[in-house]
């Protein structure tokens, strides 16, 4: 009974979070309610069941052969890709429908609405109650047209997650397309050391009042931090840092006055921070040596000056790209892209059991209208014995376009200059629009 009630609560919550759009004016009203200090991007899905996932990740055969797809396309039409960087090549492939790790976005809310309304029907086979296909007298399968509800997803992306098309971080993610399907990496102790640094900074902030009376002579009296703390101590729980510092003062400076002890703690925290940063750098080099050799080679094909080290955080990121406006379609659609990295494989998990080149997730806080897959917690990852990874989704308020209103909205958008002929400058698309018009 509890399970049924829980499911009913979930369904009710999902329904409450849906806003059905019936006209352009209703849509503009909803969009105008959004308040954010970040950059707003839109994506229109003609089918509300679609996920924020690039084409190459929609079928396993694509991600398994991503490196082959990339090279095959260039080998067939090399003149179209001559002189282009990897990200420029991926953008051109995306333009022609090749599966890539890019996902189209737009900065124009009406353009996204157009794409959400682009298709209103889908054809499906008719199914009998026993699950078999319905057929006619000749034994041919019967089909029916089903309405498709669309959706506009709205993202609010911070400046630090937006990069120009020629940035080093974009080059890192773009060149993942050249890596084989068995590419994976582990962060080893990198994540722990990063968290440790954050905790040390918090402790420094708590003791910042003693900076004004900072005694440089007192600092000179301290030995290297290695004389007070072992490498094993760096893998203590972060909340034990304060106790560790107090123990060092008690054991090594028992005769110091209270004021000096407080200053000594701050000095020790500074030394601890520097030591942790050094360990973090060594850990980063280790990860590069073990996992990123081929990736670095591919990046240097684009950027010969690229440093011989890759930040693991960048490999597992998602970035919005400030596109190069060298394509009439991108210009007309006010388009840009998300580019997706690859998530790390956790230490306790066999990489062979993980999905191929596991996709990095869009941070849930970016999505302000729509649904988004959220990170599975560490315990669930380690205890999930299923061959299929479990999916958790955060449902936020969704802008749903019912199939019955799509045609009406398309006509309204056309009056505002948003139609197939204005968004797609190619002659065949203009011809399609004119045929539909008459």
Residues covered by each model-derived region:
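Catalytic-core elements of nucleic-acid end-processing and repair enzymes
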Residues: 1-438
């Amino acid at each position: 009974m509890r399970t049924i009630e829980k499911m009913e609560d979930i369904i009710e919550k999902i329904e409450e979070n849906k806003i059905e759009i019936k006209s352009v004016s209703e849509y503009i009203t909803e969009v105008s309610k959004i308040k954010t200090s970040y950059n707003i991007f839109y994506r229109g899905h003609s089918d509300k069941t679609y996920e924020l996932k690039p084409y190459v990740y929609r079928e396993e055969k694509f991600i398994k052969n991503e490196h082959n797809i990339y090279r095959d396309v260039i080998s067939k039409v090399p003149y179209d890709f001559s002189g282009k960087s990897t990200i420029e090549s991926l953008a051109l492939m995306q333009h022609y429908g090749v599966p890539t790790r890019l996902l189209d976005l737009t900065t124009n809310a009406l353009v996204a609405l157009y794409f959400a309304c682009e298709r209103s029907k889908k054809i499906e086979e008719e199914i009998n109650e026993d699950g078999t296909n319905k057929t006619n007298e000749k034994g041919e399968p019967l089909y029916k047209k089903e309405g498709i509800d669309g959706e506009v997803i709205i993202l609010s992306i911070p400046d630090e997650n937006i990069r120009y098309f020629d940035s080093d971080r974009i080059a890192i993610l773009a060149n993942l397309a050249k890596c084989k399907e068995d590419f994976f990496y582990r962060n080893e102790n990198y994540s722990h050391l990063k968290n440790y640094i954050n905790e040390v900074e918090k402790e420094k902030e708590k003791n910042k009042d003693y900076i004004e009376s900072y005694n440089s002579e007192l600092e000179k009296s301290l030995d290297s931090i290695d004389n007070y703390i072992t490498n094993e101590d760096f893998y203590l729980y972060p909340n034990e840092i304060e106790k560790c510092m107090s123990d060092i003062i008690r054991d090594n400076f028992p005769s110091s006055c209270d004021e000096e002890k407080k200053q000594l703690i701050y000095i020790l925290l500074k030394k601890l921070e520097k030591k942790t940063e050094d360990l973090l750098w060594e850990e980063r080099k280790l990860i590069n040596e073990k996992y990123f050799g081929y990736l670095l080679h591919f990046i240097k094909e684009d950027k010969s000056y690229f440093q011989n080290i890759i930040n693991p955080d960048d490999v597992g990121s998602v970035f919005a790209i400030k596109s190069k406006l060298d394509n009439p379609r991108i210009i007309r659609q006010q388009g840009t892209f998300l580019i997706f990295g690859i998530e790390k494989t956790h230490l306790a998990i066999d990489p062979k059991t993980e999905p191929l080149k596991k996709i990095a997730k869009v941070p849930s806080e970016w999505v302000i209208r729509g649904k988004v897959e959220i990170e599975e917690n560490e315990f669930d990852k380690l205890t999930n014995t299923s061959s299929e990874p479990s999916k958790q989704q955060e449902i936020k308020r969704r802008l749903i376009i019912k199939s019955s209103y799509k045609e009406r909205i398309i006509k309204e958008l056309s009056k505002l200059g948003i139609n197939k002929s204005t968004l797609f400058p190619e002659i065949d698309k203009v011809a399609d629009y004119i045929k539909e018009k008459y």
